[in-house]
Amino acid sequence: MSIKNAVKLIEKSKARFVDLRFTDTKGKQHHFTVPARIVLEGPEEWFENGQAFDGSSIGGWKGIQASDMQLRPDASTAFVDPFYDDVTVVITCDVIDPADGQGYDRDPRSIARRAEAYLKSSGIGDTAYFGPEPEFFVFDGVEFETDMHKTRYEITSESGAWASGLHMDGQNTGHRPAVKGGYAPVAPIDCGQDLRSAMVNILEGLGIEVEVHHSEVGTGSQMEIGTRFATLVKRADQTQDMKYVIQNVAHNFGKTATFMPKPIMGDNGSGMHVHQSIWKDGQNLFAGDGYAGLSDTALYYIGGIIKHAKALNAITNPSTNSYKRLVPHFEAPTKLAYSAKNRSASIRIPSVNSSKARRIEARFPDPTANPYLAFAALLMAGLDGIQNKIHPGDPADKNLYDLPPEEDALVPTVCASLEEALAALKADHEFLLRGGVFSKDWIDSYIAFKEEDVRRIRMAPHPLEFEMYYSL
């Protein structure tokens, strides 16, 4: 969509406001809202100059001594917000550093743009396609509190396995999925059909093509909405829009949606499998006549991801909660291997009917990942594999959780904690710096920023510690 078409959308919808959105390092969207008349008074100038804001108020960004930042709207992203009472056109923005007029080196969307530019400049390909699958839970309610004398959380979900013995307005229907029993049953066990359909209707209205929606494995209403792939920056934009729609539709239904990887103990967590392929001159470079129909280029791309996986974990699995999901036997891929069939491997090659659909699927990321950063980092790791012809070795076509100890010890794993992942990123990040995609300043500031998460968890007594140690 051009500036001209964005202006037409504002005029045709009779929008009262324009909502400018951007994403911080953690992956959370922020927004500033301006009256639509300001845009219409001089659209070309407004789209060029954007909106100034205080960058020091965004965690992990500028200090207060040099905090001026600029939002530059991307007209191609404009859509009418489906939730606001007053008609409002939403536009996603790049964050610009006024010092040089370029994308701020800590702005996730600018990093993603630089990754796309680096792919083209490398000569390897001209387009990278990404197709994430963010899973999520929808609960009836959640309570949590942390204080110096009290720490607790409690999830309320009529569809949770733990609710079988509860009185619910004097009646308990009994229809709910068991632990690990939530995958695609019909109603009344699947109580989220209408909710998901409402989400899908809005997503399709925003131009995000939905391919399927269904309940997922976890009890307590775990869900997935599968959407079509797109180019890197566009697909990251759509992932942010998806999260916004999912959380707001749930809110309007009187429920609460979360993308936490592991909100429920003892059941499957939520991942964000990321499908990827590289194209050049209209040809899929991952299609070939090798293992599972892959080309050498695709195998080298896999090799790069496996080589750098522990460093990638700091970006693709950026929360302390991420590593409560990445444990064996909960359908979470912990083994750094690849396979055409084996879902215990961290890289899977989906079965497809066409060479155009040939792709690889990274299964270890989760939806707390900032999509701009995660997709850019995965691409950079894969490109390093292609550039240096890093072969991933033989595929792993047997259950990696059932290997004998001597074989199991030979298969590398993803990180076991955020602390380990940050240490890996500190030691292995040169591949991210190529083409100026990520900066050394970003690496250092990101590690320091996320180490605060590690510190907070390390300093907080856990209720399980009282169970295990209080009476010793």
From Swiss-Prot:
Residues annotated for L-glutamate binding in this entry: N268, G269, R325, E331, R343, R363
EC number per UniProt: 6.3.1.2
Protein known as: Glutamine synthetase
Cell compartment(s), UniProt: Cytoplasm
Occurrences of domain GS catalytic (ranges): 108-472
Modified positions (O-AMP-tyrosine) in chain numbering: Y401
Signal peptide: none
Cofactor section: Mg(2+)
One Gene Ontology MF term: ATP binding
Protein species of origin: Neisseria gonorrhoeae
Cofactor binding remark: Binds 2 Mg(2+) ions per subunit.
PANTHER family, sorted: GLUTAMINE SYNTHETASE
Regulation of its function: The activity of this enzyme could be controlled by adenylation under conditions of abundant glutamine.
Annotated Mg(2+) 1 binding sites: E133, H273, E361
Recorded family membership: Belongs to the glutamine synthetase family.
Keywords: ATP-binding, Cytoplasm, Ligase, Magnesium, Metal-binding, Nucleotide-binding, Phosphoprotein
